[in-house]
């Protein structure tokens, strides 16, 4: 059995009047992520970590923001496609550890639903997914509520 680790990072600007997609759900907020797709920073981060672990490039390579077919796309669809790619190479997820950096809103109450949705998309157990949240203590673009960022580390295995 071999083990591979991947790391992902993503940032999206927050803008008033947009839905705030995070972890596959809409989180109530006055702002939402600005992006070519639905701007789900957590799913994009996980996709990048998985693709990196499997040495398959990054999310931009597979789903370019210049391609019309990805305009406004639900990021859960992208995640499912990434899972096909890594499974085609013989990999399975060991675990995912992620952190969302966001000043507001407090997202703790939404994390269980995010984990459930992500587990369904990836066909893994909820216990294989960790989602944490933190602020930047009002520092940087996150602290000024101009954007949201996320980090993820994944372990994949191949028998």
Name every feature range the model reports, one short phrase each.
Residues 1-2, 159:
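Short, low-complexity, intrinsically disordered N-terminal peptides in bacterial proteins
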Residues 118:
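Glycine-rich, mobile lid/loop segments that gate access to catalytic sites or pores
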Residues 111-115, 145:
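Short, low-complexity, polybasic intrinsically disordered segments
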